[in-house]
């Protein structure tokens, strides 16, 4: 059985500026298996976020191929990519991007509304269950302004998890948190990955936290290098 959730083959990405091609990604190959926890390290501007966006179907590669759950992903129509993305992927960002006028539970329910598969009652039940998993069911009716930075990021994690994705792509998920809260968020993501068999691809500048992952890659001048493989 093929347990590869997300992969890219010979992916390159370039932009043209003032008639000059600027290479952001160069012939990148990456394979993410079920339940695997992968960290991608790199300096600011190294292309980490671009790679995450290409893997998540939010940006198109200039060359190469991206596969999601064994199906070619990068060459699909915008609508088909969106459907595949909503079904199989979750996203966590450095800034939580919670809607300020919505409560924690309402923010978590948003991806369920997009799928149009659940009644409101079912959505509330699912959102409550996942908030409990991240230890925030007692804060379900609080708006983001009433939550701490760590709590807001936990809500963002719950929102990413609520549709039961196969893989979560996280871009500097602890970048705005202090070291203690960063440790707590990383431990939570590891536990959720172990409990649900969800793959995590985490872009981070924090080498200490990255060391907890199964694999560590480093992106240097657009080229991806495997640093550690503890599988």
Swiss-Prot record:
Keyword ATP-binding: yes
Gene3D superfamilies: P-loop containing nucleotide triphosphate hydrolases
Main enzyme class: translocase
Residues annotated to bind ATP: 42-49
One Pfam short name: ABC_tran
Gene Ontology cellular-component terms listed: plasma membrane
Listed EC numbers: 7.6.2.-
PANTHER family for the chain: IMPORT ATP-BINDING PROTEIN (PTHR24220), LIPOPROTEIN-RELEASING SYSTEM ATP-BINDING PROTEIN LOLD (PTHR24220:SF689)
Official protein name in the record: Lipoprotein-releasing system ATP-binding protein LolD
């Amino acid at each position: 059985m093929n347990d590869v959730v997300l992969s890219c083959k010979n992916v390159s990405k370039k932009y043209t500026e003032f008639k000059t091609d600027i290479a952001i990604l160069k012939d990148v190959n990456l394979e993410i298996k079920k339940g695997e926890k992968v960290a991608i390290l790199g300096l600011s501007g190294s292309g980490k976020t671009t790679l995450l966006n290409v893997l998540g179907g939010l940006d198109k590669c200039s060359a190469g191929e991206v596969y999601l759950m064994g199906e070619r992903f990068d060459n699909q129509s915008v609508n088909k990519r969106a459907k595949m993305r909503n079904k199989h992927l979750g996203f966590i960002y450095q800034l939580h991007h919670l809607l300020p006028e919505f409560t924690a539970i309402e923010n978590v329910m948003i991806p369920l509304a997009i799928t149009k598969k659940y009644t409101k009652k079912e959505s509330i039940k699912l959102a409550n269950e996942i908030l409990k998993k991240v230890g925030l069911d007692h804060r379900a009716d609080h708006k983001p302004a009433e939550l701490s930075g760590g709590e807001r990021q936990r809500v963002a994690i719950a929102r990413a998890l609520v549709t039961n994705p196969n893989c979560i792509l996280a871009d500097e998920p602890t970048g705005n948190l202090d070291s203690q809260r960063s440790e707590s968020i990383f431990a939570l993501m590891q536990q959720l990955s172990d409990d649900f068999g969800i793959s995590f691809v985490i872009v981070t500048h924090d080498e200490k936290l990255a060391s907890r992952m199964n694999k560590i890659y480093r992106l240097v001048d657009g080229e991806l290098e495997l640093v550690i493989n503890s599988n």
